[in-house]
Amino acid sequence: MKDMMMEVYNRLIDNPLIREKTSFINDNGKTEYRIKFYEVPETLNTTKPFIVIDNFLGPQTNAYFANNKALSIRFNYQINVESMDRMVTKQISKAVEETMKQIGFGRLDGGLDQYFNETKRFVDARRYRKNTQIHDTDY
């Protein structure tokens, strides 16, 4: 079984700008990324740029049918980019959008482009959708 959210994650860390802005070396000397699923862990250093991948409409759904069988799967993701620098947030968001386009996701209306005074962070949240190729339903 394939995992689309992990595929998105792996493609994001393949992007040089995203890798540069979100990577860090953990206590064990291993490279990690400030790219998280669903929510931000309390232990994450939020003074540095980070990304959250969320499925804003719930789990994937069947997109096309034939003979009562799903032929394609639809994925909806919201990708939040947050940092304390507005231009860094914009640079990462642009890199995310380019990466999502490369893997077949289209951008949807909605999202967020705002500064939150409580957290002192700029947030750019964009929504994306993709239908898998016909017969690619092993998710």
For the regions a language model picked out, list residue spans one by one.
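Short beta-strand/turn micro-motifs at beta-sheet edges
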Residues: 63-69
